[in-house]
């Protein structure tokens, strides 16, 4: 058994999330986490809403609310959407908790004490019309490296390089288009050059990463410069140093604090586990260390899931923070109270999802929100599309015609039809799983196929090849469908022994396929598991709890959590024998067939949304 940390990118609370977001961080991380739990590993899946930074401040001003009011609103929207999609977080929290503030400030103080957070004078942008600070990501211009006209003041999304706003060609404000004025300002910088040797040595051992992630990360080593980790802004975590902590206009950079969220969420999870246990016993408030502190004899692995625009922060900034905290750069140093912390085992980056050939854009109305999708369609239909046709290793396109086709042809007519006709024949002819007679070669062959699927699909999931994994699982479904068609049980009414054997074999094969598909289709999997008389929980669902801030009783907020292994019997990743005599009721359709009309209806919704914003 391994301790598996599933660290999932934190969605930003400047609005509801669309399906492109969950295709990058959400569904892939949940598929992996569900499989690893079923395979017997101790999984800790954590994330939360990212609530600091300039976009929150600007949007709050536009809406006439405080940043906290804005993030409170969208935190609840995002929590509901991700829970309804079935994302099985052990803890989904937020970055405005007192716990998160304390963990981030401890990290900053220790990195600073070890000599890797250095104070420098830099050029900051001012809006000439308002006299206010203009944060770097609200400045755009032409990238001095690749020439892309649309680069931000902190990063070029075209070439992925980190930038300084003052280096942009023809810089302009994204708020009103004016040219900013640059003045001197003081900031703390993460000294990446002092951590370069340790960072490079670690990265060169990551040969198992996806090539696009590894190559991009290694290329970043060619131009390592100190990176500003504070900002001229009044919304964020205070800088925890004398002379800085009381300055209302200086805050920690949102990306410095966001990546630390994986650690702070793990700590909050452990504290809540202790609280739920009555403050004593196991698990306790230090339980998070089993995933984070290197421990001899304990296999610990950490997987970070995100879209490709966040690779830099997870393969460079976060590892550099961890190395600086441990004192493993050129200046040495000692770890802080959390001890040495594990570096990422793997950074799992997805590419971008587009829709109908266009980039998602909420401002232009080119968007399909998760909550709208789930209001009209089954969550497993969206999960399946992302798994089988999502942007795993290259950009992919979501179209309504393809969504309808895959739902109808593969889920309804393929997997759903197999479940329905098998259960219907068992119910009609026996009312329960029949006792099998002697199996023929054709029966043994189909069971050998389904049982082989556990190793094959599992191997693909462990190596982050989810598209190949779900394709293989559906290939096995096709073999079982072929078996039922070729054995023709509907023609065996006068041969009860043979009919019983075929239907027992088919039921066993369907049960096996259901386990193979459970990480991808958890809602359907649990329904099918129960319909076939299965015991225990095959695909546990998350729940939303309203909790009080652990360090501020005046604040409450929703979290996503669940009982996925602890306190429940989780069906394992293996073939479990169906039991003769188990009652089988007449089934209801598992998946809903989509009418051809939905394609034009959804396209019209998108056109109307775009017209409103034109």
Curated annotation (Swiss-Prot):
Protein EC: 6.1.1.10
Motif 'KMSKS' region mapped to chain: 359-363
Pfam families: Anticodon_3 (PF19303), tRNA-synt_1g (PF09334)
Chain sites annotated for binding Zn(2+): 143, 146, 156, 159
Principal EC category: ligase
Catalysed conversion reaction: tRNA(Met) + L-methionine + ATP = L-methionyl-tRNA(Met) + AMP + diphosphate
Family note: Belongs to the class-I aminoacyl-tRNA synthetase family. MetG type 1 subfamily.
HAMAP family: Met_tRNA_synth_type1
Name the UniProt record assigns to this protein: Methionine--tRNA ligase
Species this chain originates from: Beutenbergia cavernae (strain ATCC BAA-8 / DSM 12333 / CCUG 43141 / JCM 11478 / NBRC 16432 / NCIMB 13614 / HKI 0122)
């Amino acid at each position: 058994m391994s301790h598996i940390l599933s660290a999932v990118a934190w969605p930003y609370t400047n609005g509801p999330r669309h399906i492109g977001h969950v295709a990058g961080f959400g569904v892939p991380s949940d598929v992996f986490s569900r499989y690893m739990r079923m395979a017997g590993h101790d999984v800790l899946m954590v994330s939360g809403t990212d609530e600091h930074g300039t976009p929150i401040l600007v949007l709050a001003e536009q809406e006439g609310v405080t940043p906290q009011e804005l993030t409170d609103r969208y935190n609840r929207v995002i929590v509901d959407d991700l829970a309804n999609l079935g994302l099985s977080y052990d803890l989904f929290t937020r970055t405005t908790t007192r716990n998160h503030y304390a963990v981030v400030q401890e990290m900053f103080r220790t990195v600073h004490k070890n000599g890797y957070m250095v104070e420098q004078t830099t050029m900051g942008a001012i809006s000439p019309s308002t006299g206010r600070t203009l944060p770097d990501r609200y400045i755009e211009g032409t990238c001095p490296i690749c020439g892309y006209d649309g680069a931000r003041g902190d990063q070029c999304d075209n070439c992925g390089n980190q930038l300084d706003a003052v280096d942009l060609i023809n810089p302009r404000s994204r708020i009103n288009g004016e040219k900013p004025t640059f003045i001197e300002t003081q900031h703390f910088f993460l000294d990446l050059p002092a951590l370069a040797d340790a960072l490079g040595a670690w990265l060169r051992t990551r040969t198992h990463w996806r090539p696009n992630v590894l190559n991009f990360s290694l290329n970043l080593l060619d131009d390592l410069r100190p990176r500003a980790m504070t900002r001229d802004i009044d919304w964020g975590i205070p800088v925890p140093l004398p002379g800085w902590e009381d300055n209302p206009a200086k805050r920690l950079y949102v990306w410095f604090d966001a990546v630390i969220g994986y650690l702070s969420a793990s700590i909050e999870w452990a504290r809540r586990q202790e609280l739920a246990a009555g403050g004593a016993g196991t698990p306790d408030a230090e339980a998070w260390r089993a995933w984070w502190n290197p421990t001899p004899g304990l296999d610990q692995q950490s997987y970070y899931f995100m879209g490709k625009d966040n690779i830099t922060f997870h393969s460079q900034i976060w590892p550099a923070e961890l190395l600086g905290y441990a004192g493993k750069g050129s200046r040495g140093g000692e770890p802080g109270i959390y001890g040495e912390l594990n570096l990422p085992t793997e950074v799992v980056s997805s590419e971008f999802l587009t829709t109908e050939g266009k980039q998602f854009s909420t401002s232009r109305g080119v968007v399909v929100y998760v909550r709208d999708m789930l209001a009209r369609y089954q969550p497993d239909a969206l999960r399946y599309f992302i798994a089988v046709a999502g942007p795993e290793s290259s950009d992919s396109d979501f179209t309504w015609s393809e969504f309808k086709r895959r739902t109808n042809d593969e889920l309804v007519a393929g997997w759903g039809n197999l479940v329905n006709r098998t259960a219907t024949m068992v119910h009609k002819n026996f009312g329960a799983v029949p006792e099998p007679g002697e199996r023929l070669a054709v029966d043994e062959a189909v069971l050998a196929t389904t049982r082989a699927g556990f190793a094959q699909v599992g191997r693909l999931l462990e190596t982050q090849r989810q598209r190949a994994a779900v394709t293989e699982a559906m290939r096995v479904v096709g073999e079982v469908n072929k078996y039922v068609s070729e054995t023709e049980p509907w023609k065996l009414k006068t041969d009860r022994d043979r009919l019983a054997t075929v239907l027992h074999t088919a039921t066993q094969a369907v049960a096996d396929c259901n386990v193979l598909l459970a990480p991808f289709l958890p809602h359907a999997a649990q329904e099918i598991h129960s319909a076939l008389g299965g015991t225990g929980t095959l695909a546990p669902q998350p729940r939303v709890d309203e909790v009080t801030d652990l360090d501020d009783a005046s604040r409450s907020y929703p979290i996503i959590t669940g009982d996925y292994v602890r306190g429940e019997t989780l069906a394992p990743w293996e073939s479990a024998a169906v039991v003769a005599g188990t009652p089988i009721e007449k089934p209801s359709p598992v998946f809903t067939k989509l009418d051809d009309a939905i394609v034009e209806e959804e396209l019209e919704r998108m056109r109307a949304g775009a017209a409103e914003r034109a």
